[in-house]
């Protein structure tokens, strides 16, 4: 019988994901500016949805780029 280690979310479950926290949001996007999938980030489904909304809001407010074509 296999035992699976429970994955720990990189963001505590009670901590809000704010679109103004650019340093936090940058940890979950690629170098090209794409949102990383849940299997890579290790977030819960609810946190991943909140993260996607926060990143999209930050892009609209020009806090994050839509595309990062540098480098």
Curated annotation (Swiss-Prot):
Keywords: Ribonucleoprotein, Ribosomal protein, RNA-binding, rRNA-binding. PROSITE patterns: RIBOSOMAL_S18. Signal peptide: none annotated. InterPro entries: Ribosomal_bS18, Ribosomal_bS18_CS, Ribosomal_bS18_sf. Part of the 30S ribosomal subunit. Forms a tight heterodimer with protein bS6. Binds as a heterodimer with protein bS6 to the central domain of the 16S rRNA, where it helps stabilize the platform of the 30S subunit. Belongs to the bacterial ribosomal protein bS18 family. This is Small ribosomal subunit protein bS18. It comes from Thermosynechococcus vestitus (strain NIES-2133 / IAM M-273 / BP-1).
């Amino acid at each position: 019988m296999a035992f699976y280690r429970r994955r720990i979310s990189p963001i505590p479950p009670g901590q809000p994901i704010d679109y103004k926290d650019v340093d936090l949001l940058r940890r979950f996007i690629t170098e090209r500016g794409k949102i990383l999938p849940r299997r890579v980030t290790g977030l819960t489904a609810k946190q991943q949805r909140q993260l996607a909304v926060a990143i999209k809001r930050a892009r609209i407010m020009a806090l994050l780029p839509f595309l990062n074509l540098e480098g």
